Curated annotation (Swiss-Prot):
Reaction catalyzed: N(6)-[(R)-lipoyl]-L-lysyl-[glycine-cleavage complex H protein] + glycine + H(+) = N(6)-[(R)-S(8)-aminomethyldihydrolipoyl]-L-lysyl-[glycine-cleavage complex H protein] + CO2
The protein's Enzyme Commission number: 1.4.4.2
Stated role: The glycine cleavage system catalyzes the degradation of glycine. The P protein binds the alpha-amino group of glycine through its pyridoxal phosphate cofactor; CO(2) is released and the remaining methylamine moiety is then transferred to the lipoamide cofactor of the H protein.
Protein name: Probable glycine dehydrogenase (decarboxylating) subunit 1
Example of a GO biological process term: glycine decarboxylation via glycine cleavage system
Superkingdom of source: Bacteria
Species annotation: Staphylococcus aureus (strain NCTC 8325 / PS 47)
GO MF term set: glycine dehydrogenase (decarboxylating) activity
A Pfam cross-reference name: GDC-P
Amino acid sequence: MSHRYIPLTEKDKQEMLQTIGAKSIGELFGDVPSDILLNRDLNIAEGEAETTLLRRLNRIASKNITKETHTSFLGAGVYDHYAPSVVDAMISRSEFYTAYTPYQPEISQGELQAIFEFQTLICELTDMDVANSSMYDGMTSFAEACILAFSQTKKNKIVVSKGLHYQALQVLHTYAKTRKEFEVVEIDLDGTVTDLKKLEAAVDDETAAVAVQYPNFYGSIEDLEKIHSFIEDKKALFIVYANPLALGLLTPPGSFGADIVVGDTQPFGIPAQFGGPHCGYFATTKKLMRKVPGRLVGQTQDDEGNRGFVLTLQAREQHIRRDKATSNICSNQALNALASSIAMSALGKQGIYDIAVQNIEHANYAKQQFIKKGFEVLDGTSFNEFVVKFDKPIQQVNEELVKYNIIGGFDLGVVSDDFKNHMLIAVTELRTKDEIDTFVEKAGELND
């Protein structure tokens, strides 16, 4: 190039045309019919000075509603949590700043160790034997868990609670469409928890797995011990989609006999933003280790006895055994997994426990305030979400709340007509008493 920073100067163009034997750009495109050529300049504005452009873009961006400008009570799978400042500082290091595991992985011992630590932290939270290096998001992890269950048990039916996130169920049904022999049976709710009688009746010897969410989509905590008792003698797998932050306080699924625990680590160090990215986790037992999708990092020793890390059990993966792979997914969210690892490490076991307790306390306070205001709050032991019934459409209420710089809860009417005019409200450790009181007060005024 004739200029170090500006490509395609007139001199560059002439040199390229001369090299290929064309006299002009018009001659270069001479084979294109003239009636479809645009014989004028594009109708776009001239370039702007950087300062002018930044001012204009900032004006446009200021129209956005964000958790920095508004108080958010929106959850439904994506939550407004505290992320330690060290997270962004660490993941911005050039050694880490990529979403991919390297294709010559053993060269990058630091990155492999970081992934190994993520796997270890997930195992500790879930009380499981092994975890993979991450997946795209929790819903992908859930669908892959169901596919593993079909493969392991050689059965064709999976029983799932309607208390699972509705989009997780949509992903599962998308997977099932490509496997016509698979049957997905959805179990109704009893209030905001799974109807255990219907669940027990649906589980039979043809059931590959039973899947529930913990806490479930409606914020209620399912009875994992009782659910597991229904499937013990059916040789079906027990899949639990769990909020990892809640596991800092709740008894982990592994202690209830779960075979696979999946979820999304977004509550740890990953900002709430429309469309992601997220970070799915996938944890299971040693028995199912060789069927786990995605990458696994293992600890080993080199010839000199030094600790080292490797990608292990790679024969499971589609880049090794494409026709017999346990999954078509090898990519992962290594950068977000690192962010979650840093957040968990910075908080520590006690810190995660403390934040989980704050979520429960703040949510319960908000519940009581709504009840005092005369709202119907649906029954259920909850973590940081609960359901409130309104007299008016939720969309209308939320549109009005925005005027008071409040982002309201999720409109459950989108999911089911049974929950028309019901709002799913998330109250995390970041919400203050004043913010909760203001939200309840304005919601009461708008509901009159």
